[in-house]
Amino acid sequence: MEVSNLPTLQDIPLPWQQDIWRSLTARLAAAKLPHALLISGEAGLGKTLLATAFARLALCRSPVGDKACGSCTSCSQFAAGTHADFNRIELEERDGKAGEDGQLKSAISVEQIRDLIGSLLLSSSRQGGRKVALIEPAELMSISAANSLLKTLEEPPADTLLLLVTAAPGRLPATVRSRCQSVALAAPATAVALDWLNARQRREDWPTLLGFCGGAPLAALDVAATGIEERRKAFFTALARLRSGEANPVLLAVHPKDAYPELLKLLWSFVSDLILIQSAGTRAPLVNRDQLPLLQKAAEGINLRSLYAYLDRIQAAIQALDTSANRELAFSVLLSDWATGLEELNNAPLAAHTAWGWT
């Protein structure tokens, strides 16, 4: 069943964004906004919606309370994507080479940032208010682009607001981060997220989907709409077949390029559940509780140290997704490790696991 009632700008702030929204709008009303905000948080928390709604409010000529009016000339132009004082910088499409139609470039270019700076510096506000720029995903600015933006962050034009949106603030240069005021979104309490999800569609599997998505409600909505349940069960069955020698890891690793983020996330949730079973037993809060018999069997004969080391490798593969030239090979290596029962990882060095998690 397709999920309906996806959030829009009219729904902002979402329940878990209300405190941040109140703080931002109060500073806007008091004319105490910094020149640049770094809005961060994991995927699926509505960062871009929040930033876009705030940009619209900052440009609105007749705000109603802490919301944009939606009917003034500024709001009408914003909705139409024609507001002369609003710039959105995002990944551009590739240049149409064979097999690349519709695909996005891997980085925000220095040319895009230079064009933005030119717009901010060389022209005054067309409507007599402020100028707003939204850069997303900010962590994908090239080094040259980030360096080009730095001068503007150090000496911002008057009446200009820069909104940098990112799911990975650590990938931005420290010099850029230090010149922005941080606005960090956190995942809501599970009860809050489930109430919000069930208000849009009643589903018994929301707890599983929410856990799979690291507690991010919009990500849970997204995966629910893609029919992930059948793919999840099929993938876990394939992992069981790998352990029993009934499947070939090289063949199982062959997928379309855009499938690997989901597959790695599934593998991460599978292994993290095995760690919970090994360390806390079957009453632990498992993401994939509906697959408990399969998980219990998978946990047999594998020690906790090996599972932690394997989780480190999965996390490294996740973090390398944007730069990995051969996702299939990297995924094949992970599946081969699993097929051998993680034997080579028994004495592997471990990263710190005081706060490991999906990012």
What are these regions (language model features)?
Residues 1-57, 65, 121, 158-161, ...:
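Charged, glycine-rich active-site and insertion segments that engage polyanionic ligands
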Residues 1-144:
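Clamp-loader machinery-focused feature within the broader ASCE/P-loop NTPase space
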Residues 71-74, 85, 119, 137, ...:
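Residue-level recognition of specific faces of alpha-helices
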